[in-house]
Amino acid sequence: MVAIRVREQEETIASGRNQFALIMFTRPGCEFCESQQSILEFFINKYGWPVRTVDMDEYPNMAAKFDVTMTPTIIMVDKNSGKSMPISIGVISMSDLALKLYRSIRYMRGEITPQQWFMHDFEKGKSNDPLKYTEIQ
C-alpha cells in the first residue's frame, strides 16, 4: 500500500512540472528562508520543477497579489490559467512538500473535490472515499 502511494505521488508531481510552477517569497535576513531554499533545491533536482524566488521587499505588489505576509511562503501557480494555491507558510519538509503538491495538483486539475483531499487516487470509490456514501457523486 505504501509503495502504491509513493509511486502515485511521485508520478503526479513529475507530471505537473510542465503545468505548474512554484514561487517562494523571501526577505533579506530570513534564516528560515535559507533553510527552505535548501529543501527546494533538493526538490528541483528530483522533479525538475520551475521555482522562482521573490523578495517581498523588492516586489511588494507581487506579494500583495498572492496575499503573502510572512516568509518563507510557497505558492503553486498553474502556468496556463494563472490560478494559484498556497502550499506552505514557514519551512516545510521535503516529504510534506511532496504530499501537499500531490494533493494540490490533483485538486487544481479537478481530479478530486475538497472532501477527497486526504485520499490517494487508488482509494476512489472505495471505503475511504467520502463521496462513495453521499449524493454528491
What are these regions (language model features)?
Residues 10, 37-41, 60, 94, ...:
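Extracytoplasmic/secreted envelope proteins and their assembly/folding machinery
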Residues 1-17, 106-121:
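N-terminal leader/targeting and pre-domain segments
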Residues 5-6, 23-26, 44, 48-63, ...:
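Thiol-based oxidoreductase modules, predominantly thioredoxin-like and allied folds used
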Residues 28-35, 55, 66, 89:
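Extracytoplasmic/periplasmic, Sec-exported soluble proteins
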Residues 63-71, 85-92:
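Thiol/disulfide oxidoreductase modules built on the thioredoxin-like
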Residues 1, 8-46:
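Local sequence-structure signature of Cys/Sec-based thiol-disulfide redox active-site neighborhoods
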Residues 71-79:
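Acidic, Ser/Thr-rich peripheral helices and adjacent loops at domain boundaries
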Residues 78-137:
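Non-catalytic, surface beta->alpha helical segment in thiol-disulfide oxidoreductase systems
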